[in-house]
Each structure stands twice: as structure tokens, then as C-alpha cells.
Amino acid sequence: MDFLTDWLTNWLKELLIGGIMGNLEGLFDTVNTQVGEIAAQVGTTPAAWHAGVFSLIRQLSETVILPIAGMVLTFVATYELIQMLLEKNNMHEVDIANLYKWMFKTACAILILSNTFNIVMAVFDVSQSVIAQAGGLIQGSTDVSADMLAELETSLEAMDLGPLLGLWLQSALIGFTMKAMGIIIFVLVYGRMLEIYLLTSLAPIPVATLSNRELGSTGQNYIKSLFAVGFQGLLILVCVAIYAVLIQGIATSGDPIGAIWGTVGYTVLLCFMLFKTGSIAQRIFGAH
């Protein structure tokens, strides 16, 4: 009878240990996979992310928004000319050099406005290049080796049946948590790209105000917002990379229960910080 009880207990322990290790191996595999996917997604330029959407946004910007921006620039240039003429004793003293300066300034503003889309894409090309380089470095440092999981399995074998059952239930719960985190990451990464497209579609209007001293703050803040959204991808990548490195420490801690709940805590922390990346990027670049 004792032999049968021992056999059944050992069989259940092996079953639970196998289930726990399966959950944890899948959990750590998910971490590595998500790091790679995020590196690929946030490192993709708007043109390469979705060709159809990119073409639509470009047509909208160049055919609908650009003419409106041209009217804004006309108003800005005319307003500056009137101000310049009235500065010198109500047009009694007109400095010809100032007229040449105004013509040169207006010509530069027209040139910039006509190339707005290319300038905006150049901003994102710079940020995506930095993200791609960082993604290559980060991907190489987040692999969870088989030795780490082997140490964890050894500690599981020394546990009794009751704690193993509870640990298996907890590991299953963590699996659902990781899926929820994947959805949150999906929303953030894809939402960021949609934000980039929306910013790009209306780009000519704020750019048209850059040449004016009083209204130029609108265009300057827009440029800052472009850099903030572009480099937000780097902050997202850094957050997930830090998370993956912390998970490595959990895998080698030798405490299965601590590993499970440590993963829960780090997952919640990651989701919180991912939501904060946008505001952090805006503070860094002074956008508001």
C-alpha cells in the first residue's frame, strides 16, 4: 500500500513539475519573442510598416493639408511684411535690406513647406535607425538558457505535492498575465505608429508657422513632438529589455514561488512603464 501511495505521489509530482516547467518555459520564451517583436515593430519606419496606409497619409498630406498650409504661410508672410513696414515710422523710413531679408526668409519657408513630408520622414528615419541599432544589442542579451531553468527544476523536485499543486495553479495564472501583457504591448506599439501617421498627415500646417516669431512656437512644439514620438520607441524597447533581464534573475533565484510572483510584479511594472514612455519622451524633448 505504501508502495502504491509513493508511486502515485511521485507520479503526481512529476506531472506537476512538468506542467510548471512547461508554463515557465513558455513564459520565458514569450519574453524573448516579445522583445524581438517589439524591436522589429518599433524599429520599422512609417513607410515600411504599412505601404497602403503610408500612401494614403502621404496623399492626404500633400493634396488636402498642404494647400491649407500654403494659405497659413501666406497669412504669416503678409503679417510679417506689414509689421516690418510699420516698424519704421509708418512706412516713412523703409529699409530695403529688410525687404530682401523678408524675401529670403519667405523663400526658405516655402522651400521647407514644400518638402515637409520628406523632413518629417527624415526625423523618423533617424529615430528608427537608433532604435534598430539598440534592438540588435538588446536582443542578444535577453536569452534565458537551459541551465537557468534546470536549476529551477532541481528546486521543484525537493518540494512536496501540496506546494507543487499551488505553484502549478499560480504558474497557469501567470500565463494568462503574460497574454494580457502581450495585448497591452500590441496596443501601445500599434497605437504609437498610428499616432505617427496622424502627426504626419497634418504636418504642413504647424510647419507653415515656423518662420514667424510669434506663431513659430506652434511649429517648434510640433517638431519636438515628432522627436518625442520617434524616440518613444527606444524607451519602449529599453523597458522591455530591462524586464527581460530582471526575468533572467528570477530564473536563477532558486525560489520557485518567488519566481512566480516576482514575474507578476515585474509584468505589472512593465505595463505601467510602457504607458509612461510617451510622457517621458515628451518631457525629454520639451514637447507639450
What are these regions (language model features)?
Residues T33-I65, L85, N89, A109, ...:
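Internal transmembrane helix-loop-helix hairpins in multi-pass membrane proteins, together
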Residues V207-K224, A251-S253, Q282-A287:
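Alpha-helical transmembrane segments
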Residues L16, T106-L202, I236, V240-F285:
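Non-cytosolic segments of integral membrane proteins
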Residues A48-T63, N90-N98, P163, L167, ...:
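Membrane-helix interfacial "entry" motifs
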Residues G70, T74-L86, I236-A251:
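Juxtamembrane "helix exit" motif at the C-terminal ends of alpha-helical transmembrane segments
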Residues V72-C108, L202-G216:
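Hydrophobic transmembrane alpha-helix segments characteristic of membrane transport
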Residues M1-V72:
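Binding/recognition "hotspot" determinant
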Residues M1, L8, L12-N23, V94-I112, ...:
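Alpha-helical transmembrane segments and their helix-start/interface "positive-inside/aromatic belt" motifs
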